[in-house]
Regions:
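Hydrophobic, aromatic-rich transmembrane alpha-helices
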Residues: 279-305, 309, 341
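Specific aromatic-rich, kink-prone transmembrane helix
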Residues: 149-168, 174-182, 337-340
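Hydrophobic/aromatic-rich transmembrane helices and adjacent perimembrane loops
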Residues: 194, 316-317, 322-360
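Short hydrophobic alpha-helices at membrane interfaces in multi-pass membrane enzymes
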Residues: 164-183, 212-222, 303-313
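Perimembrane helix-loop-helix junctions
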Residues: 3, 7-8, 195-228, 294-299, ...
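Transmembrane-helix motifs of polytopic, lipid-linked glycan transferases
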Residues: 31, 97-117, 125, 132, ...
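Short periplasmic/luminal acceptor-recognition loop of GT-C membrane glycosyltransferases, typified by
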Residues: 178, 196-197, 387, 396-449, ...
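Membrane-interface alpha helices of multi-pass inner-membrane proteins
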Residues: 173-190, 196-201, 229, 312-321
Length: 545
């Protein structure tokens, strides 16, 4: 059968129209993502960002993570930060700007995924909802954390995965590219490995019946090849720099111990606390997502239910790996959550078919249900809070919002080659001052878990500190240092070392609004503490002459 001339002319018009809509949709997604994030670019670093920024800074001096500085995160995050720090911008703004680019790319990928089973309009809804919730301060979405950078290659792998499973024309190249994308995601955060394992398990259920076993095996092998190529390159790099053993221990061995440190009762407590916080902005989205998942079977068939439910379960495994359930861990749950919510919203929208419910009213209602609570949460951060106030609101009880000012003070009273020992977990101060840490442990969490080698590591750290002769000690112990079963040798040693060699320089005090100020000692005497203020558990000390 041949097509009529009118039919042949009509198809190119449809393709051009579809392309125009796609381009317009992607531009809209990018613009909205930028509009949501640009006002938040100046929020000061939190501690994870501080560690990445510090190591990214030291990369410019030929130093390496794992070999020169301890860190348990995979390597990609440090090179992304190094790229951001090379921009001619304020470092905090530059890092968050690069994060914004990744966030926009992730939202665009989610649109390409969603339109396959939701169509173009609801695909745009999915992407815009993702852009909104992913920047939610309650989920710590303003920070340039590993989940933010992991999301783009992970979602790109899903774009390729759906093309492979539904179209079946990818041959061997597409699975290899998918494996490379997964490898990049894992290089941002190890838990992305669960995403690839889910794809392997779900593949036979999502692909066609013809040659299912052969195609599933081929997909597994070729995607594994893609990951092996990428990670093989990483291993060769560290081997060439005599740092392979350090890389393996930090990124893998230590993390296997790390994820076993939290008992199940405490895991549950952490989970409940975080979910209670996230519910303030996401509760209605969760309910609509549950409706979407429940109605998927009857409307779309088995494959979509398997895909979305499996993706959600895999993401939850990643969230749960360490047991701490920090809010930013839940960012990896957002893609399947948003897709299910869009399905649920579309189902609710379809209930009002006919003239009884105006289209405009349905649109307003769906928008309010999905975006209302997140918008209420985000509003003061966009229009009222200063960057420091935003940091205090997002991370109550932490000094992140006031660390830039404290860092500026320490930069003035120290020399560029002076070293700082932080008895705590505030590596962002090292970055703000551009001063080297007195020990390779730029934050001390790896020394205070119930690890068999904790005492040996703490003793090694004391040797490094003595050799470095730090000009300044920042004493700001974290509550996690004192969890049951933690070795306290370094705590006792630090107190004795301070007593023998250091004088008080300043107190960090916190007022009732959570603002931290630096009170400098006068003539060796403690500064007066205003009534109602408290010493924030932080004392800065300088060496005795």
């Amino acid at each position: 059968m041949t097509r009529s001339p009118d039919s042949r002319n009509h198809l190119p018009d449809q393709n051009r129209s579809r392309l125009r809509f796609t381009v317009l949709a992607l531009l809209t997604i990018v613009v909205v993502t930028a509009a949501l994030r640009v006002p938040l670019l100046d929020i000061p670093f939190e501690r994870d960002e501080g560690e990445y920024a510090y190591i990214g800074w030291r990369l410019g001096f030929g130093e390496l993570p794992y070999h020169d500085w301890f860190d348990q995160k995979p390597p990609a995050i440090f090179w992304v930060y190094r790229l951001a720090l090379s921009l001619p911008l304020d470092p905090v703004r530059a890092v968050h700007l690069v994060g914004m680019v990744f966030a926009a790319g992730s939202a665009c990928c989610l649109y390409l995924i969603a339109r396959r089973f939701l169509g173009h309009p609801w695909g745009v809804v999915s992407a815009l909802l993702f852009a909104l919730i992913s920047v939610d301060p309650l989920i710590q979405g303003t920070a340039a954390n590993t989940e933010l950078f992991m999301s783009l290659p992970l979602l790109l792998s899903h774009v390729l995965y759906l093309q492979e499973t539904t179209d079946g024309r990818g041959g061997k190249v597409l699975p290899v590219l998918l494996g490379i994308a997964n490898g990049i995601a894992i290089a941002c955060k190890q838990v992305a490995l669960v995403n690839w394992l889910f794809m392997i398990v779900a593949y036979p259920m999502l692909t066609g019946k013809e040659s299912r076993a052969r195609r599933s095996l081929s997909f597994a092998l070729h995607s594994a090849l893609g990951m092996a190529l990428f990670w093989g390159g990483i291993a060769l790099f560290f081997h060439a720099h005599d740092a392979l053993d350090d890389f393996v221990f930090n990124v893998f061995t230590h993390n296997f111990d790390y994820i076993q440190t939290i008992p199940y009762a405490q895991r549950w407590s952490f989970f409940v606390d975080t979910v209670s916080t996230l519910a303030r902005s996401q509760l209605l989205v969760w309910l609509v997502a549950a409706i979407g998942l429940a109605t998927t079977w009857s409307r779309q068939g088995t494959w979509l239910l398997v895909y979305l439910a499996g993706w959600a379960v895999a993401s939850m495994v990643g969230v749960s790996a360490s047991g701490y359930y920090f809010p930013h861990y839940f960012q990896q749950m957002l893609p399947p959550l948003v897709l299910c919510a869009a399905l649920g919203a579309r189902w609710l929208y379809s209930l009002g078919r006919g003239d009884r419910v105006p289209v405009s009213a349905k649109r307003v209602l769906c928008t309010a249900v999905l975006a209302g609570l997140p918008c209420v949460t985000l509003y003061p951060f966009l229009f009222h809070y200063t960057p420091a106030e935003a940091a205090r609101s997002i991370y109550p009880g932490n000094p992140f919002g006031d660390m830039p000012a404290i860092g500026l003070n320490l930069e003035k009273v120290t020399k560029p080659d002076d070293r700082i020992y932080i008895f705590g977990a505030e590596p962002e101060l090292l970055f703000y001052t551009r001063r080297l840490s007195a020990t390779r442990y730029i934050f001390l969490f790896p020394l205070f878990g119930p690890y068999e080698d904790a005492l040996a590591k703490q003793m090694q750290a004391t040797e490094e500190i003595v050799a470095a002769k730090p000009e300044v000690i920042l004493y700001v112990p974290n509550a996690l240092f004192f969890m049951p079963g933690t070795e306290q040798y370094l705590t006792r040693w630090t107190k004795a070392y301070i007593e023998q060699h250091y004088d008080e320089y300043a107190y960090m005090t916190r007022n009732q609004e959570g603002v931290i100020s630096l009170k400098v000692c006068m003539n060796g005497e403690p500064p007066p503490i205003p009534e109602g203020d408290e010493v924030a558990g932080v004392i800065l000390r300088t060496r005795k002459v």
